[in-house]
Amino acid sequence: ESQLQLSLLLSSTGMYTESIDVLESVDRQKVVSRLIADYYTCFDHVYGELSVYTQDKTLSGHYWTISQAYKDSLYAILPPESEEYLMMREALLRDQHQYEEALKVNDLRLAETEVNTPQYALATYHRSLIYKYSNDNLGEKQNLCLSAISDIRSAIKDHASLWMLAQLLYEDGDMERAYQYMRFSWNATKFYNARLRSWQSADVLSLIDKTYQAMIEKQNDRLQQNLLLITALLVLLIVALGYIYRQMKKLADARN
């Protein structure tokens, strides 16, 4: 059981080779029946991740085929009402663009979770993906917010929801919040040492950071210009007051 948990942890942090090595060290014949689903899930997860993130398109198809084979095995043994089954069902419906049906399945998952738990964070993150692919920007943001809050309150250091939310805010021009969220997410990623998340968020962080720094420089330039303008106006005011004082003094002397 500990080896399966280790494998899932390794694949979740982008250490795919290490994850597969751990799985291949497990003797399938010695896996007890209650852990068979976990065993298949680990294989499905690592090969599913590889199919998405490998740079080799040929290997991507190969990894996807392996992942689907383990999914089929999971469908055959998982209870239809289980969280694992519902999560797979939701992903399948989402990939088939059946977004309304996918939301209904997600509703079932949310009904079994509590706010500010890892399970709630995962369910709302998956819900944000449904809204993303159905082009509902507001729904995507709302669920990323809910997911990010639950991640933080659950002390989860892998902030996928937060950096995705930061990217959306950046695209909307909300640079201040995008920068703060991305920085917070990046610091957590470094603490967690998540290789995959670091790779995913590095480009976004760099882009947001450069844009934010450019915005700060522009604001500083504008502030400097305003200070120069205020200084010039202040000098003119002093000169004007001096001129008025001299004129009033001349007028007073003339009257005397």
Task: List the model feature ranges, each with a label.
Residues E1-D221:
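A "functional boundary" signal
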Residues Q213-N256:
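Alpha-helical transmembrane signal-anchor helices
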